[in-house]
């Protein structure tokens, strides 16, 4: 019996040992599997974010390019000055505001056939609820009600302080929501899950209501309606996308003009004014600060509370003060003119190398950008520097004016008539006054709308976005101590889980647009604050399709979308990549190492991605650890050409520049009609030709416009604009090929070649 019992124990021990080993093996496999999935998820996330931030940098560069042109162009008439003002500031004349406030929307008739929601003011809770239901059923609000709602919203916002105060004493809880970006499904889901706004349920929406999503108009209308119904319980903060210049690139302007073709211009003009009146931050129980982006080491809540926020029309363009002319500087400029030299602003080199296009910026533009009085990064000039620049600028304007008069281009101005200033000098205020935000005020607003937290100590310029700052834990700690705060809630950044704590849990990022990059890419979230101010976070996925996917399926789907976008980015820079590959192939063997491939790709795209980890998804495996780069570039071209029947080199240009071209089109289309008129084309061409030494008559400009107007309807639409760009690129490529062939023939005949093609 004893022997039998010991044998049974021995076998039981062996079985248990095998079971433990099997469990450990399964656990190890599972952990490896989950680690690989997490690595894929993080790489995918980095791809999406890098491409998004690269687009923001392109927006800043494009705007700087147009600012460069406008800042060095003196209009020859009030008509030209008004056009340039509309390009960037959409000047709000007092008489327009008075007309709108006087009920201009009442002249818009609502037809009997209209079946959408109807509004009457003052709004009641049932009106706002009906609006949500109508939008859920994909009904559209009539332009009359849109304008009426916007006018009432503007009147309400104008009465609010820059920093709203919310107390949990009057509401059971305060719900803070982050970016929505035109995703109506997320807004409806929040109301469904958390409840509609009420006196017991306060809401704070933390900016970025518009752009990127397809329902930005509907999101705005719902938010504005509930704010009017519950003015004490429903609060809105301004985000960096509540900006008409940002809207030109990211879709909101296009959406408004598509949905409201007749009254879209008036709606956009009113929205620009409404955005300027949005409060900048919200304080909950004086302990929790809610703002869109973040803070900097210079953030001053007292200054933010008392500045005139309506002056900040756009955070993309700082408006400097007008200064009196400097006589000594004027005398020096006059001497230059008498000697036949063209006046050059002080911050440009005397050779004045001008940018030929917003896609290839020259040294002159770089010097200009380095010397601009107000650019988006952290630093800002002092008052003496601004004064000197204003004086130089005025002297240049005077000097150019004299040149025009001497050349007979302008009639003698009437006595007392002032010289026109460049459009960034001022913005016309109600009553004819001048709105002049100081650089310090402008920087305060830029910092709270554009900044991001960082793990490193200190505060530095946010070069990734092109605006605001990176602020470290020490900056957060000093702000908390100074204003006796316990939590900073911000948005502005998409997070995989919809939220993220940092800086010792004193900074909370909330992002409410789920599936932001792709279906399944991220969750949305909102945070609830009770009297104890303990954050309670709720996560969600507004798209039901993601609920049926496994984690592996969801990551694979998002990864495929990210890699497709990355391959498009690589194809758009094929020419630059080929140049870099050749530098690393001195023997012209046609192959480079995979390590050189990764280095070359990063040097061209500057996306900061882990290219060696992404290599298996982008490059076919090679036993020799080398890559035939020409065949790889050809494979990228074939993938894109399968979707577009266009020559590879031309398609590359369109892929690279389409967003910039569409933004340029909307900038030139200053009245938001969806077309470039002959007058808009003429004024823009004068702007370019004046700085590129191109002599062309008005008849020549008209002929050029007619050549672009392919369907001869009297104006240029976006398709004609892009087609003209394609044809110009094609002719340039054909001319380049012809020049190469000619230089080759010359070299073969024994003569020296003028240089490489």
Swiss-Prot record:
Gene3D superfamilies: 3.60.21.10, EF-hand
Active site: 241
Domain EF-hand: 572-607, 656-691, 696-731
Calcium keyword on record: yes
Region (Disordered): 318-349
Limits of the IQ domain: 21-46
GO molecular function: calcium ion binding; Hsp70 protein binding; Hsp90 protein binding; iron ion binding; manganese ion binding; mitogen-activated protein kinase kinase kinase binding; protein serine/threonine kinase inhibitor activity; protein serine/threonine phosphatase activity
Ways its activity is controlled: Activated by calcium.
Binding site for Ca(2+) 1: 585, 587, 589, 596
SUPFAM superfamilies, per the entry: EF-hand, Metallo-dependent phosphatases
Start-end of Basic and acidic residues biased regions: 321-335
Classification via PROSITE patterns: EF_HAND_1, EF_HAND_2, IQ, SER_THR_PHOSPHATASE
Pfam families per UniProt: EF-hand_7, Metallophos, PPP5
Protein name (Swiss-Prot/TrEMBL): Serine/threonine-protein phosphatase with EF-hands 2
Organism: Mus musculus (Mouse)
């Amino acid at each position: 019996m004893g022997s039998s019992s010991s044998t049974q124990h021995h076998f039981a021990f062996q079985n248990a040992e095998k079971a433990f080993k099997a469990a450990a093996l399964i656990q190890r496999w599972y952990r490896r599997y989950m680690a690989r999935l997490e690595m894929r998820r993080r790489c995918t996330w980095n791809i999406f974010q890098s491409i998004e931030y690269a687009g923001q940098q392109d927006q800043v560069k494009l705007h700087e390019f147009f600012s460069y042109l406008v800042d060095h162009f003196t209009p020859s008439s009030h008509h030209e000055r008004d056009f340039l003002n509309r390009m960037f500031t959409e000047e709000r004349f007092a008489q327009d505001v008075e007309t709108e406030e006087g009920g201009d929307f009442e002249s818009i008739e609502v037809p009997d056939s209209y079946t959408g929601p109807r509004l009457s003011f003052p709004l009641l809770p049932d009106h706002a609820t009906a609006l949500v239901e109508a939008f859920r059923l994909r009904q559209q609000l009539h332009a009359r009600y849109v304008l009426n709602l916007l006018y009432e919203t503007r009147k309400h916002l104008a009465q609010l302080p820059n920093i709203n105060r919310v107390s949990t004493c009057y509401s059971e809880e305060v719900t803070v929501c982050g970016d929505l970006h035109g995703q109506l499904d997320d807004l409806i889901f929040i109301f469904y899950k958390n409840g509609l706004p009420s006196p017991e349920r306060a809401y704070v929406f933390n900016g970025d209501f518009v752009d990127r999503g397809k329902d930005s108009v509907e999101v705005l209308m719902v938010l504005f309606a509930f704010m009017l119904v519950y003015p004490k319980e429903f609060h809105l903060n301004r985000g960096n996308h509540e900006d008409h210049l940002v809207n030109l690139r990211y879709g909101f302007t296009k959406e408004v003009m598509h949905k409201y073709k007749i009254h879209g211009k008036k709606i956009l003009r009113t929205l620009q004014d409404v955005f300027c009146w949005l409060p900048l931050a919200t304080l909950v129980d004086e302990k929790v600060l809610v703002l869109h982006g973040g803070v900097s080491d210079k953030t001053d809540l007292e200054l933010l509370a008392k500045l005139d926020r309506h002056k900040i029309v756009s955070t993309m363009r700082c408006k400097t003060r007008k200064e009196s002319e400097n006589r000594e500087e004027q005398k020096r400029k006059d001497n230059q003119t008498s000697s036949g030299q063209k006046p050059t602003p002080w911050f440009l080199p005397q050779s004045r190398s001008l940018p030929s296009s917003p896609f290839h910026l020259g040294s002159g533009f770089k010097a200009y950008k380095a010397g601009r009085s107000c650019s988006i990064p952290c630093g800002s000039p002092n008052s003496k520097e601004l004064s000197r620049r204003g004086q130089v600028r005025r002297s240049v304007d005077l000097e150019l004016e004299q040149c025009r008069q001497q050349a007979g281009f302008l009639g003698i101005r009437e006595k007392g008539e002032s010289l026109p200033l460049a459009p960034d000098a001022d913005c016309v205020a109600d009553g004819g006054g001048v709105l002049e935000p100081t650089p310090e005020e402008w920087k305060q607003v830029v910092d709270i709308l554009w900044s991001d937290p960082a793990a490193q100590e200190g505060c530095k310029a946010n070069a990734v976005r092109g605006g605001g700052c990176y602020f470290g834990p020490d900056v957060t700690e000093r702000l908390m101590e100074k204003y006796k705060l316990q939590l900073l809630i911000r948005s502005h950044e998409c997070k995989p889980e919809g939220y993220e704590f940092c800086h010792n849990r004193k900074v909370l990022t909330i992002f409410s647009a789920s599936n932001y990059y792709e279906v399944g890419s991220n969750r949305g979230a909102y945070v609830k604050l009770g009297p104890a101010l303990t954050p309670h976070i709720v996560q969600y996925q507004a798209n039901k399709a993601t609920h049926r996917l496994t984690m592996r399926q969801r990551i694979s789907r998002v990864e495929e979308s990210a890699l497709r976008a990355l391959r498009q980015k690589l194809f758009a820079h094929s020419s630059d990549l080929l140049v870099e590959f050749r530098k690393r192939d001195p023997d012209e063997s046609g192959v480079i190492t995979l390590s050189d491939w990764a280095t070359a790709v990063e040097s061209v795209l500057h996306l900061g991605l882990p290219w060696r980890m992404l290599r298996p998804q982008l490059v076919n495996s090679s036993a020799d650890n080398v890559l035939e780069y020409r065949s790889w570039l050809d494979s990228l071209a074939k993938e894109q050409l399968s979707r577009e029947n266009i020559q590879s080199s031309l398609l590359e240009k369109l892929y690279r520049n389409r967003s910039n071209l569409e933004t340029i089109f909307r900038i030139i289309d200053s009245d938001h009609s969806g077309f470039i008129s002959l007058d808009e084309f003429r004024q823009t061409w004068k702007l370019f030709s004046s700085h590129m030494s191109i002599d062309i008559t008005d008849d020549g400009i008209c002929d050029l416009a007619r050549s672009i107007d392919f369907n001869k309807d009297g104006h240029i639409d976006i398709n004609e604009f892009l087609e003209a760009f394609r044809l110009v690129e094609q002719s340039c490529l054909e001319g380049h090929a012809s020049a190469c062939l000619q230089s080759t023939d010359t070299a073969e005949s024994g003569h020296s070649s003028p240089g490489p093609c």
